[in-house]
């Protein structure tokens, strides 16, 4: 799905990422970990194309739908909570309009064997398939269900987003990202502004999410419950572990011990050769 090949990023004489390589496949659930400033958020921005590497390439399908929740964003909107959330369905609503138009045209045509008629049938079936994930629920119902899951009360749906704090506006943005049903989710500290109940709801949602996930979080339990692969960013390099966070901690400790033992053995060999 996404390949990061020989990627480096330097600025001001400092190398943040040094020739890193890794691949994100369909269904991968990756926890991106490392100290603050290691480059985790930058990797997400590089994948999105918000930032450009100094060298190397990121390969991804041109039609890949990426959902991205940054750690911080500005909010200057006067729409109601529900109206702002419903903007996530702009593409879906456009598809519904197109489906209605095709259905109307098919009803008026009688050239059933023509190429044009058959193409309309194919297009209608394609749109129907793309809309099938709604599972009988209207966009409004899905939006309301997601907002409730993220902690909003129904009586708050018609309040202006400008009357809510940045934390609550981030919940609205998260709802929109989830409702767009992307092929891959890139989430940067999504639990920062969530209470326990909302975190539990988000965990359950992500566990059932059929796409790929790249998650940055300081919540170890959340990482364990939502990911099965851990990519550590350390001093410009990455270390890829095919396990969740807790198992990664154990394997990382073993790796450090092995490196320490190898270094000590090398030092002993040097001392012997110089004796």
Model regions and ranges:
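Short cytosolic helices in intracellular loops of multi-pass membrane proteins
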Residues: 267-275
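ABC ATP-binding cassette signature C-motif
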Residues: 1-265
